[in-house]
Design a protein with these regions (language model features):
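Solvent-exposed, well-ordered loop and adjacent helix/strand elements within mature globular domains
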Residues: 1-90
């Protein structure tokens, strides 16, 4: 288990096409990570979010930061920024 600073994103942020760094479609359960901290493809469990797959990256996602994909912009705003526990390959 590790503690990470989490933010939330929507698949269409920045005019993106919703395709992750690993080529999958982004959706709830997809998270962006720094692959130097959490390898892409890792199965994760985040108590405030649920089960997830590390399938994406992001320019601001460096070190112990994680970005959780949400289904709506409202969910992103409600989530905000917070520290979360991340269980890797649980």
């Amino acid at each position: 288990m590790t503690t990470m600073n989490a933010t939330a994103y929507h698949p269409n942020d920045g005019g993106g096409d919703g395709i992750t760094a690993t080529g999958t479609k982004a959706g709830y359960g997809t998270v962006a990570v720094d692959p130097n901290v959490i390898p892409l493809g890792s199965k994760l469990y985040i108590p405030q979010y649920g089960e997830a797959i590390a399938a994406d990256t992001g320019g601001a996602i460096v070190g112990h930061k994680i970005d959780l994909c949400m289904e709506s912009y409202e969910e992103c705003y409600q989530f905000g920024r917070r520290d979360v526990q991340v269980f890797i390959n649980y």
